UniProtKB/Swiss-Prot annotation:
A Pfam family: NAD_Gly3P_dh_C
Name this protein carries in UniProt: Glycerol-3-phosphate dehydrogenase [NAD(P)+]
Species whose genome carries this gene: Idiomarina loihiensis (strain ATCC BAA-735 / DSM 15497 / L2-TR)
Protein family per UniProt: Belongs to the NAD-dependent glycerol-3-phosphate dehydrogenase family.
Lineage per the UniProt record: Bacteria, Pseudomonadati, Pseudomonadota, Gammaproteobacteria, Alteromonadales
UniProt xrefs under PROSITE patterns: NAD_G3PDH
Role noted for this protein: Catalyzes the reduction of the glycolytic intermediate dihydroxyacetone phosphate (DHAP) to sn-glycerol 3-phosphate (G3P), the key precursor for phospholipid synthesis.
Any one annotated GO CC term: cytosol
Amino acid sequence: MQTPQVTVLGAGSYGTALAICFARKGIPTTLWGRDADKVAVMQTAHENEEYLPACPFPESLKVTADLGEALKDVKNVVVVVPSHSFSSMLKQAKPLLAEHARVAWATKGLEPDSGRLLYEVAEETLGDEHPLAVLSGPTFAIEMAKGLPTAISMSSTDQAFVEELSGLLHCDRSFRVYTNNDFIGVQLGGVVKNVIAIGAGMADGIGFGANARTALITRGLAELTRLGLKLGAKSETFTGMAGLGDLILTCTDNQSRNRRFGMALGQGKGVEEALKSIGQSVEGYRNTREVVALAARNEVEMPICEQIYAVLYEGKEPQQAAIDLLSRERKTE
């Protein structure tokens, strides 16, 4: 049997979609899922009926719940688990990684409690033995799985890794991969946009309209850029796929869980009720707390993120948060 060239860890909607994209090109791909019962269903159905119904698996994609089997002799590993599971996933995988393995992730978030970027977590856990890379950009899983045109950014600490992995994923007809040497900026864009998307959803849930949504996206981009520059990112990253691209998609399309969560809040649901109504992980909920703490540590002003935090964690009404934002002192753009 041919050794898989790519293993994707995490069989949710996005992990499954990425695995399909690799396998669609004929690349031997393994998708690992934690839940053995759900994996057995996928093995029988040849699709992920729970998250991506009617998206059949290519012949070169296999699914397993055996982590050792999934990682054996694999060169390219892509982690796609929620940010709160990222550290534990790496610790579980580390002793099973091949000596030559390179590790990428498509997780968008910060480490809970510490607020560290995920590359810091990966470096601490894996050391310098394995090259690292991150995938980020404006993508919805269902559209990727269906082969609809998509573009993302990929950044790495190792140029050979990013060139090879981007080449495996890139497809002239449906999937364009842009490489980017801003390892910090590509990661940060995927985090902050989740928070701003909650705000955009709240504004629409309240009924504020397109003008307010556009203003919020624009000023949200300014907040992202301020924080990114303070952390050493490049400003041009935030006008690319991993910044503005992801921000626009997540703030304007109802496929976004973060946006739908915000809309539910704007329509009067409480935080817990709104979270339950989504039915899947809402990364922006945790991201909000972590981003606000990160900004405070670095003395970066992020008023939109701060007001969203007040709604999620301090019981402020969304309407009052909007009033407080609009009542801020006028200033030069």
